[in-house]
């Protein structure tokens, strides 16, 4: 936009409207500037004003003309068609975009040396550490997980911090920015804060040293009584009802509400936290915590927990995924693989992909929703072997088996082996069905990438070899920026099915005692997978009926679930 100086006539109109300036020569305006829409305004420093020629919607169907009324501005740029009114203190050192509505606020200010929460180093998972996660606008769950997991690697840690700092220094604005279409009303204090396009701040108590991202299709809402300090808020997030966020990264489309207090934590992708608190917590994608008593501290949470239930909360059960604890009198019993055939798991498998509310433009964190993958199947293989070893050591006729101080009934142990085996058959059939779509001959993989251990890097399922390669490539300069690292994550995710086939092919041969995989073998494996899938859905149906009898679900929900199970013919994840 080009600006010009005020004319004498415009200055006279402004003065008649009770406006004044330290120096009218420092007030610059657009070519079509209209002074009639400014009243009771005081200007200090360098001022740049856009057009005021349109109405702006301040509430649904309630339009007011753009302009500036009852405000003090110092070193401020105001875009076209903004309405700024009732600024009780002042606006200082800010650039305000087009079509913004700012009303009934106290202070909006940028002070010297601020970084808007970017570059802040926090301690996640380990509160005693010197800090392991660098807050930056590019942060996603994978990058944060890498920082936490390898925080002991000084070379990697320093390299990542330097990358983040270089990027921040390049992009950091000299003063605060309010994006286009932003609405700020009934808010006390906003200092050293960037507000992205189409954000709304309504009734907040304080925003300080914070970057709030936002776009037209993923705007951010910050509501009543919210305090947010030294943090970064991603596209589509919402902070509501007296939430307190300090030294945090809040990811895409996350909701923090109802007095939830978060400190020194990272929260990613579709998480919903209400009433409780988080401290030095790594809340991966789809972390849900809605209890007033919930305390997320020094741990990693997220979608993976929803699939594994009690296992991740009990160290004695970590090697037996999908298991459950029950008590009878003073005895605690372990029921292996119990959760694998529950309606709760079935709901989770189908629910989470549908609940990803992120628009494509705001999907930074990668989330692989496969509940059966090389990562989880490897755990299942080991768990099945543990149960078989217990049976072999104590004998098939033993009434009970002991595992890390927990008792496993004989029937539960046998059922656990069957459930784990059922999952393995479902998985193998699903992989073959997918591969047949583009490789009907089921050719043996020609690469080793995908062999060995796998990891879940906060939603990204990948071979450990690829994860270690990322670490080495960061340290030797092959990956020379945060953007390059993020692109590598995307590339690995895109290769998931190929890596999965490399891992699964030898597993299938070993499981079925084959030397090669023929079309006839594939038909046999898919047939067994379909039978296993039917057994699985029958078990889930029985569990749903139990929930209905206990009053946990109503009859309509039960019928809907049965209808869904009746159409379960696809054995793919």
Set out the residue ranges of the language-model regions.
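Glycine-rich hexapeptide-repeat left-handed beta-helix
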Residues: 9-52, 56-68, 77, 85-172, ...
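Long, compositionally biased intrinsically disordered regions
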Residues: 327-573
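Long, structured ligand/cofactor-binding scaffold of large enzymes
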Residues: 70, 79, 170, 176, ...
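Core alpha-helical transmembrane segments of integral membrane proteins
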Residues: 178-182, 186-203, 209-212, 217
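Intrinsically disordered, low-structural-confidence terminal and linker regions
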Residues: 1-8
């Amino acid at each position: 936009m080009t600006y010009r100086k005020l004319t004498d006539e415009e200055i006279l109109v402004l003065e008649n409207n009770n406006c004044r300036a330290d120096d009218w020569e420092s007030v610059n305006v657009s070519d079509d500037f209209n002074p009639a829409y400014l009243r009771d305004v005081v200007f200090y420093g360098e001022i740049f004003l856009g057009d005021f020629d349109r109405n702006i919607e301040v509430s649904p169907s309630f339009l007011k003309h753009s302009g500036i009324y009852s405000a003090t501005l110092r070193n401020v740029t105001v875009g076209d068609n903004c309405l700024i009114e009732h600024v009780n203190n002042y606006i200082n050192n800010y650039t305000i975009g087009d079509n913004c509505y700012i009303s009934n606020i106290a202070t909006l200010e940028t002070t010297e040396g601020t970084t808007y929460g970017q570059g802040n180093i926090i301690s996640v998972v380990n509160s005693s550490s010197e800090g392991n996660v660098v807050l930056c606008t590019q942060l996603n769950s994978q990058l944060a997980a890498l920082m936490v997991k390898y925080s002991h690697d000084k070379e990697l840690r320093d390299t990542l911090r330097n990358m983040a700092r270089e990027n921040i220094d390049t992009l950091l604005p000299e003063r605060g920015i309010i994006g286009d279409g932003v609405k700020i009303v009934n808010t006390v204090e906003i200092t050293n804060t960037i507000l992205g396009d189409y954000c709304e701040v309504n009734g907040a108590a304080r925003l300080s040293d914070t970057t709030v991202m936002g776009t037209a299709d993923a705007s951010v809402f910050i509501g009543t009584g919210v305090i947010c300090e030294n943090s970064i808020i991603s596209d589509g997030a919402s902070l509501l009802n007296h939430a307190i966020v300090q030294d945090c990264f809040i990811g895409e489309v996350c909701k923090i509400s109802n007095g939830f207090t978060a400190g020194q934590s990272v929260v990613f992708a579709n998480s919903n936290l209400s009433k409780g608190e988080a401290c030095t917590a790594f809340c991966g994608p789809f972390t849900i915590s809605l209890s007033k008593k919930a305390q997320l501290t020094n741990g990693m949470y997220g979608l993976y927990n929803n699939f594994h239930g009690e296992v991740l909360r009990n160290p004695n059960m970590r090697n037996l995924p999908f298991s459950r604890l029950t008590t009878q009198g003073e005895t605690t019993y372990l029921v292996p693989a119990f959760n694998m055939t529950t309606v709760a798991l079935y709901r989770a498998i189908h629910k989470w992909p549908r609940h990803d509310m992120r628009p494509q433009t705001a999907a930074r964190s990668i989330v692989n929703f496969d509940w059966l993958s090389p990562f989880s199947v490897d755990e299942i293989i080991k768990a099945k072997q543990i149960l078989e070893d217990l049976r072999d050591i104590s004998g098939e006729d033993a009434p009970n088996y002991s595992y890390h101080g927990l008792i496993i009934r004989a029937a539960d142990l046998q059922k656990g082996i069957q459930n784990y085996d059922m999952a393995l058959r479902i998985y193998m059939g699903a992989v073959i069905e997918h591969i047949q779509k583009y490789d009907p001959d089921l050719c043996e993989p020609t690469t080793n990438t995908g062999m060995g251990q796998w990891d879940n890097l906060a939603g990204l399922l990948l071979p450990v070899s690829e994860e270690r390669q990322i670490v080495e490539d960061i340290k030797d300069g092959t990956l020379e920026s945060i953007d390059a690292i993020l692109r590598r994550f995307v590339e690995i995710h895109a290769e998931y099915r190929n890596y999965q086939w490399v891992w699964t092919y030898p597993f299938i041969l070993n499981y079925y005692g084959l030397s090669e995989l023929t079309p006839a073998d594939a038909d046999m494996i898919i047939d067994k997978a379909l039978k296993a899938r039917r057994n699985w859905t029958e078990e889930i149906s029985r569990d749903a009926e139990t929930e209905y009898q206990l009053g946990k679900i109503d009859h309509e929900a039960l019928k809907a679930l049965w209808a869904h199970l009746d159409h379960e013919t696809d054995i793919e994840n």
